[in-house]
Amino acid sequence: MAKDLKFSEDARQAMLRGVDKLANAVKVTIGPKGRNVVLDKDYTTPLITNDGVTIAKEIELEDPYENMGAKLVQEVANKTNEIAGDGTTTATVLAQSMIQEGLKNVTSGANPVGLRQGIDKAVQVAIEALHEISQKVENKNEIAQVGAISAADEEIGRYISEAMDKVGNDGVITIEESNGFNTELEVVEGMQFDRGYQSPYMVTDSDKMIAELERPYILVTDKKISSFQDILPLLEQVVQASRPILIVADEVEGDALTNIVLNRMRGTFTAVAVKAPGFGDRRKAMLEDLAILTGAQVITDDLGLELKDASLDMLGTANKVEVTKDHTTVVDGNGDENNIDARVGQIKAQIEETDSEFDKEKLQERLAKLAGGVAVIKVGAASETELKERKLRIEDALNSTRAAVEEGIVAGGGTALVNIYQKVSEIKAEGDVETGVNIVLKALQAPVRQIAENAGLEGSIIVERLKHAEAGVGFNAATNEWVNMLEEGIVDPTKVTRSALQHAASVAAMFLTTEAVVASIPEPENNEQPGMGGMPGMM
């Protein structure tokens, strides 16, 4: 395929048009009075959203040079979303400001490499200043505030706060679509996996069709159990202890399954058999997790252990186990706390190391099951369009809240970026490096300016007053009042603000140092229809 080339100013101006088109579509959503954007979707209803990264991903421009500019800003939004989970609109506004201001200076003869050095130096100081003014998230109320600001909905903030309170900061919180109008929170405490009883005759409550075991022993093995004789010595010890038993095995079948069911029906003992969760290596890891949580020893050939030699001290215990047709939930496993903490640390290290999103998700699930449980926020709405929009807002709010717990919070509404303006302006630099610092200084004001403009106010007036205001005092665009942002609960996670600034600066610096752009020339479409032999006028 042939290529078309543009150089220096032509290339940068063409890309800038693309940057502006994408950024102008995204930045109308920032702030409490930001608007929505409607996205056309093939084969389904249009999506109405104010989520920056969702809008950015949908934009594809016809002109290849403009499209490259738009793709660069998409990268800012994607990277910020990937690392912080929110702040994509702020990142887009910052990137547009740095690119526009930088390009003016490059056109005037500034050296792009010098500008880049100044931008990098300013961002480094800005991030240090952000961490200095950052405050830890101390309580449930502050977590709710972060979620409420991100989603622009206090109810959503409250649900997220309750979910994190129930399952812990490492717990898994999933967002699902509800069949009703109301949004609800459902919490599954303990370790739950997707395997149910192997026979309905094992249930203890025939009305609900569930098996509830109080203080059961738990046998964990990766073996198939076919012969009842293999587990008979162990079951005799369990009967003497007058306690029920949960058997988690690769499979319980044949003679073993028949005898367990018969003895259950006769009332000799209570035993429930379930298949081991997962497959392959993941199954082995999940069995080890269950063993550590309950204090069991995995009976496996790898350790040279046989079922017929198993004793009570190889079994795990829990305060309660509930087994349905499809799920098994182990509540309050009695495993050693130190072993559980060590296992949690090991899984966290694996999450850091893996590049696979799928593996990361599965490891996160395992971590949650060990660390506390799983919370499900079921999103309700009156229409499918509203449901999609609400779900996106809750996802953003959840990511924002996690980021706040991780690195703390700063004054929201763009206030923190203006609060660090003074610190960045003190950088000693000369020439193009100084110009690079000034590019960042102007960008630090851009989010507040845009929030004010979206509220129908003159942005530059708000920015100037904010520069001279006391640290932490900012403009509440929702009420048009000057307030202490932290006291009012108008906060942003430090991680979100930091990531937005870093990624915007990175892409802006790359943009300014671009000297040539290569685009593909599309092949001309062949509209000629093939001839049909044998017909008049045809070949």
UniProtKB/Swiss-Prot annotation:
Q: Which domain of life is it from?
A: Bacteria
Write out the entry's keywords from A to Z.
Answer: ATP-binding, Chaperone, Cytoplasm, Isomerase, Nucleotide-binding, Stress response
List locations, semicolon-separated: Cytoplasm
The primary location reported for this protein is: cytoplasm
> What Enzyme Commission number(s) does the record list for this chain?
5.6.1.7
CDD domains (UniProt xref): GroEL
GO MF term set:
ATP binding; ATP-dependent protein folding chaperone; isomerase activity; unfolded protein binding
Q: Does the keyword Phosphoprotein apply?
A: no
Q: An example Gene Ontology cellular component term from the record?
A: cytoplasm
Q: Which positions in this protein are listed as binding ATP? A: T29, I30, G31, P32, D86, G87, T88, T89, T90, G413, N476, A477, A478, D492
Q: Which reaction does it catalyse?
A: ATP + H2O + a folded polypeptide = ADP + phosphate + an unfolded polypeptide
Pfam families per record: Cpn60_TCP1
**Biological process, per Gene Ontology:** protein refolding
Q: What class of enzyme is it?
A: isomerase
UniProt similarity note:
Belongs to the chaperonin (HSP60) family.
Could you give the subunit structure recorded for this chain?
Forms a cylinder of 14 subunits composed of two heptameric rings stacked back-to-back. Interacts with the co-chaperonin GroES.
Function, as annotated, reads:
Together with its co-chaperonin GroES, plays an essential role in assisting protein folding. The GroEL-GroES system forms a nano-cage that allows encapsulation of the non-native substrate proteins and provides a physical environment optimized to promote and accelerate protein folding.
The name under which this protein is listed is Chaperonin GroEL
Originating organism: Staphylococcus epidermidis (strain ATCC 12228 / FDA PCI 1200)
